């Protein structure tokens, strides 16, 4: 058998564990993970390379009904991805019925010829019988190429899933150099790490009304330290106070937690300078969304 290479999309309803699975497979923190919905905004590619194969994983936003221009962008990215990849991993939870959200996703799967593996995540949370029942229900809705039950957070059956993925990929050369784990810009990864901490620490409404813009990343010439300056933009003035917190304690907590992840990412000491500003209505500002990379030319993909 020759060398295999291909693109694999992770799709599913919000918070079924797509980003957690991607991070488990790569054993690197590339995709933002949080218990709150719609945490993944960009198609973060994670790249797994061995002597025998290279798999490029595309982590899509959860498919949902759009409520803003940003949401519309997220949906378009997810739909576009289904058409472009070599394989789709459709992730579900073992305690879910085939509700309106799943039917919506399955309808989109039926519109493309891409093979699909059904991945049942979080099997550590329910009895085996319930997992089997869930698989049976979903197999009645769609003809999957294969089915794998996993626990991404406990690393259960991850190697089995990788074997199934590789078996369905086409033969071909590598797309990326061996030491690549993602093709995302450095500033985007840093911004997503900071945003993840806001998702963990802040109230439900606030994190989805913010974006992070990394102004600069500089390595000091005289010391093994990286200086990062970043701005947190929120939609409402009231949110600004929540993000900063009493006596700046919340912003300090966000910064300290992000700094630890950034130091692990860079392998050296990081000095993180965070600022908070208000920018009303940014999620419906088409010009700003394009600047942030949330732009899509629909004609290109029709």
Curated annotation (Swiss-Prot):
Kindly state which keywords UniProt assigns to this record, in alphabetical order: Cell membrane, Cytoplasm, GTP-binding, Membrane, Nucleotide-binding, Ribosome biogenesis, RNA-binding, rRNA-binding
Principal location listed in the UniProt entry: cytoplasm
Q: Does the keyword Signal apply?
A: no
* InterPro entries attached to this UniProt entry: G_ERA_dom (IPR030388), GTP-bd (IPR006073), GTPase_Era-like (IPR005662), KH_dom-like_a/b (IPR015946), KH_dom_type_2 (IPR004044), KH_sf_prok-type (IPR009019), P-loop_NTPase (IPR027417), Small_GTP-bd (IPR005225)
Q: Which SUPFAM superfamilies match?
A: P-loop containing nucleoside triphosphate hydrolases (SSF52540), Prokaryotic type KH domain (KH-domain type II) (SSF54814)
The identity of this protein, by name, is GTPase Era
Q: Which NCBIfam families match?
A: era, PRK00089.1, small_GTP
List each copy of the Era-type G domain by range: 4-171
The entry's GTP-binding residues are 12-19, 59-63, 121-124
Mind telling me which GO cellular component terms the entry cites?
cytosol; plasma membrane
Give the bilayer topology: Peripheral membrane protein
Would you identify the family this protein belongs to, as annotated? Belongs to the TRAFAC class TrmE-Era-EngA-EngB-Septin-like GTPase superfamily. Era GTPase family.
């Amino acid at each position: 058998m020759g060398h295999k290479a291909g693109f694999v999309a992770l799709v599913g309803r919000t918070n079924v564990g797509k980003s957690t699975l991607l991070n488990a497979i790569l054993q690197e923190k590339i995709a933002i993970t949080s218990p709150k919905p719609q945490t993944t905004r960009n198609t973060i590619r994670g790249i797994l390379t061995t002597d025998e194969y290279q798999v490029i994983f595309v982590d899509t936003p959860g498919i949902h009904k759009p409520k803003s221009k940003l949401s519309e962008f997220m949906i378009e990215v997810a739909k576009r991805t289904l058409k472009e990849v070599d394989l789709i991993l459709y992730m579900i939870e073992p305690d879910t019925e085939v509700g309106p959200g799943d039917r919506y996703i399955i309808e989109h799967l039926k519109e493309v010829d891409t093979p699909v593996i059904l991945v049942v995540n979080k099997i550590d949370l329910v009895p085996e019988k319930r997992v089997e029942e869930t698989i049976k229900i979903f197999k009645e809705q769609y003809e999957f190429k294969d089915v794998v039950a996993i626990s991404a957070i406990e690393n259960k059956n991850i190697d089995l899933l990788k074997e199934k993925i590789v078996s369905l990929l086409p033969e071909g050369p590598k797309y990326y150099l061996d030491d690549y784990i993602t093709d995302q810009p450095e500033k985007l990864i840093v911004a997503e790490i900071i945003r993840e901490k806001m998702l963990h620490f802040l109230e439900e409404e606030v994190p989805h009304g913010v974006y992070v813009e990394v102004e600069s990343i500089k390595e000091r010439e005289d010391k093994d330290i990286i200086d990062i300056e970043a701005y947190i933009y929120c939609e409402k003035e009231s949110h600004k106070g929540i993000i900063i917190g009493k006596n700046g304690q919340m912003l300090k907590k966000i910064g300290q937690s992000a700094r630890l992840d950034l130091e692990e990412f860079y392998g050296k000491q990081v000095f993180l300078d965070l600022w908070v500003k208000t920018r009303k209505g940014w999620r419906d500002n088409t010009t700003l969304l394009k600047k942030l990379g949330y732009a899509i030319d629909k004609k290109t993909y029709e």
